[in-house]
Amino acid sequence: MITSVEKVLAITRSILDKVCPNTFNHNTAEARAAFKGHTEFIARNLVETDFTRKQIIPYVLAKCGDKYLCIQRTSKQTESRLHNKYGLGVGGHINDEDQSPDQDIIDAGMRRELNEEIQFPDEVSCKLVGIINDDTLEVDRVHTGFVYVLESSTETFDLQEKDQHLPSWKTIAELTELEPLMESWAKVVFHNVIKAAT
């Protein structure tokens, strides 16, 4: 029996570190240009332990008015390294099926992941605001985050995989109290996107 191997988009670590040397980087246009020719699809089971590359993860922060969507990951979530932590983004790996001649592959992967994980009743806008290159945890050393801000006019949404995520809308003051329990990327986004905008 032939089983398919999941392949995910990854960036060469040396290129990423050169263009995005900081934990959070605002130079998204420069980074996109520099990454051309330095990304490839690799079997996920191989790249999970390959520290010469980082898997590209679209990470979408949802905002409605003065509140942000906060998601606690349950122990049923597949990534055990993030169990019970609070996240501020939804997203996931970019697969080769996301390739399209009409759309940037990272944007296409972001839209697919967003549609798979969460649906808002109205059309929402998403803007790329930065790139995370953090090595705080083991999981961070093999992933880089493309951070998008989603602006919604309503707090109403439909979240898939409800057994894996506990969502709630939080103000900045409420997020400040939760910061010690946040996953590392959520802390980066909290300081460099949410608090930086106030």
Model-derived features with residue positions:
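Short, flexible beta-strand-to-coil junctions
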Residues: 11-16, 63-66, 152
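Acidic, metal-coordinating catalytic segment for phosphate/diphosphate chemistry
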Residues: 22-67, 73-77
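Conserved aromatic-histidine-acidic binding/catalytic patches
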Residues: 48-52, 98-102, 106, 136-140
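Nudix hydrolase/Nudix homology domain
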Residues: 2-4, 11-12, 39-42, 84-97, ...
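Extreme N-terminus nucleophile/cap motif
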Residues: 2-36
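Residue-level signal for secondary-structure boundary sites
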Residues: 19, 68, 154-158
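A short coil-to-beta-strand element that immediately follows conserved catalytic motifs
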Residues: 121-130
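Conserved Nudix-box catalytic region and its N-terminal flanking loop in Nudix hydrolases
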Residues: 67-112, 116
